[in-house]
Swiss-Prot record:
This is Sulfotransferase ppzF. GO terms for molecular function: transferase activity. Keywords: Transferase. Pathway: Secondary metabolite biosynthesis. It is an enzyme of class 2 (transferase). Sulfotransferase; part of the gene cluster that mediates the biosynthesis of pyrrolopyrazines, secondary metabolites showing insecticidal activity. The role of ppzF within the pathway has still to be determined. The single multifunctional NRPS ppzA is sufficient to produce peramine via condensation of 1-pyrroline-5-carboxylate and arginine, N-methylation of the alpha-amino group of arginine and reduction of the thioester and the cyclization to form an iminium ion resulting in release from the peptide synthetase. Its EC number is 2.8.2.-. InterPro entries: P-loop_NTPase, Pyrrolopyrazine_biosynth_F. The gene is ppzF. It comes from the Eukaryota.
Length: 340
């Protein structure tokens, strides 16, 4: 139950790839949290099927602006976004009918409006097409800061948490996983654009929720606490922050898990390859690895390492993305939840 209203609450963990979201879910031990449900694929990702189409290397939609998509491609994607949304709706109704609060994670890239995606990837003049919005009985408003396919009215039924991580750690980490999945040649050929690793969308949604605090589903005296921002550094180095967060969202801090068993080789062999590529370090761990924090990191030094690891062209592109994301990251970091 929500600590604020006494009713089942909807908690949205909004992130970008490689922000230690799987580590956070591991620590929260959602399966052990009373009166909480976390569904979809691995705690959420209801809109992953749409992203799978957008990033399918066979049809190369990800390499083209929305203005160059065929009618069939548009229809397929619109149908998929709607199907994802309806699946999420059915799951929500089931969980809430049992009196359970929900905790769901989603990467911004998974439920991003394709017009916003094209403008980010190809420039603001890539399309003047109106934003895509799924059909929802509760409303169809789509304001400027809302970069998702979800209408404002639906977003405002959730209490949002934004998970961030230093771009100089998150961005190259994501590129490494793409190499593991697709090979270096394919990843490089796409010039990293397919990853759409951006903090801009998280900031935009954060500002959307700040502007609409009065409409959030919590008691008036709690609204200034939302939206919440968590930095991966604090999850890694300051467990008290997770305990505080747990208390704020109505979870039981006694269920938090900071140590676990390493997966055995036979267990790893049963895991889907793409999932292994994204989570191998977590599966092989027995607890939090404090070396994963950004403490003392220097972008100039990291860029030198990237050139050695990825080659000059890819490294320069990653560096450009990292430097371009720092203002949004620092903006959100300054507003993060802290236990001290």
């Amino acid at each position: 139950m929500s600590a604020n209203t006494g009713k089942p609450a909807r908690h949205y963990l909004i992130s970008y790839p490689r922000t230690a979201s799987n580590l956070l879910l591991k620590i929260l031990a959602l399966d052990s949290q009373p009166n909480f449900s976390s569904g979809g694929f691995d705690g959420g990702y209801f809109f992953m099927p749409a992203d799978d189409i957008l990033t399918d290397p066979r049809i190369r939609v990800r390499a083209r602006s929305i203005s160059d998509w065929t009618a069939d491609e548009r229809a397929q994607l619109k149908e998929t976004f709607q199907a994802c949304f309806e699946a999420q709706q059915r799951w929500l109704e089931s969980a809430e009918s049992q009196g359970q609060s929900v905790f769901v994670k989603e990467h911004t890239v998974f439920f991003a409006d394709p017009t916003a995606r094209s403008c980010l990837q190809f420039g603001p003049s890539a399309t003047s097409e109106p934003a895509w919005t799924v059909e929802y009985a509760g409303g169809s408003t789509h304001s400027k800061l809302n970069i998702t396919v979800l209408p404002d009215e639906f977003l405002l039924t959730w209490l949002p948490t934004f998970l961030i991580r230093h771009p100089a750690l998150a961005f190259p980490s994501l590129y490494r996983t793409v190499i593991k999945r697709e090979g270096k040649e394919s990843a490089a050929a796409d010039n990293f654009a397919s990853l759409l690793t951006t903090v801009e969308w998280s900031r935009s949604l954060y500002d959307f929720y700040v502007q609409n605090r009065e409409s959030l589903p919590c008691s008036p005296d709690q609204r200034l606490e939302w939206p919440i921002v968590l930095d991966a550094d604090d999850i890694i180095a300051h467990p008290a922050t997770v305990t505080l967060y747990c208390d704020k969202i109505g979870m039981d801090p006694r269920q938090l898990c900071f140590n676990w068993d390493q997966l055995k080789s036979e267990e790893l062999s049963k895991i889907e390859p793409n999932q292994l590529a994204m989570r191998m370090s977590l599966y092989q761990s027995t607890g939090i690895d404090t070396s994963k924090s950004s403490r003392g990191i220097n972008v100039d030094d990291e860029a030198t390492k990237w050139r050695s690891e990825f080659g000059i062209a890819v490294a320069d592109h990653i560096e450009k993305l990292v430097r371009g994301a720092m203002a949004d990251y620092e903006y959100l970091r300054a507003r993060r939840l802290r236990a001290d």
